[in-house]
Amino acid sequence: MSKSQYFALAALTLCAIQAQASLVMLGAQDFQGTGLGAVNTILTLQSPGSTSNESGSVGRAVGNPNDVITGNAMTGASQTQTRTAAELGLTTAAQLRVVFNALEPGASNSILLNNLQLNIFSAAGALLFNSGAFTAINFSDTFTGAGNSGFVFGLDAAQAAAAQSLAFGAGFGTNRIGLSANLSNATGGFETFFVANAPAQVPEPGSLVLAGIALLGMAASLRRRH
């Protein structure tokens, strides 16, 4: 299946997924240069030995100045760590995006994401927000290679409003973002999750031309009036 075909299929499933979950898949997207060092990776998982299940989390705890890392999370440089909202460039809860990137072999590159939860902690380690229940998603094609393609998640409207109230108030830039995840049918390398602010949409060239024509028309109209 080609990437364009898979992205179209993924889009058709979004409505059903969004009706059942708090952290919902918004779509699949190609990424270039999104290896571990190129993005703000929060969580990296790898199934131990010959097993096919992996789970882990990274978060904070009151009274502990360091990250609390559990399960099969990898702890190498830039692999697993909480990051501040300011470091991630976050602006609002509604604009927060979690991107899942799987590294599975070409012959068996499907994977099941059983659970994915977003946690936001205060600078002191108190849990301010948890995204709650998640509906499992089976990815029949993950496109091999770290950084090739990612699956983008965001909060549903209710959870975005709750997160905004609880964790995006005054001074929210010092709050820290953590994640927890559970996957099965993991037969390859490592799976990574990074967090970013939703990028501003770049207008299509045709849209820019139309906008330019409209502006020229407005300018001509103003000149005629004067």
Go through the PLM ranges and name each one.
Residues 22-201:
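Helix-boundary and membrane-interface capping/anchor signal
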Residues 222-226:
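Short, charged juxtamembrane terminal tails flanking transmembrane helices
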Residues 1-23, 186-220:
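Short, threonine-centered small-residue motifs that mark membrane-proximal processing/anchoring sites
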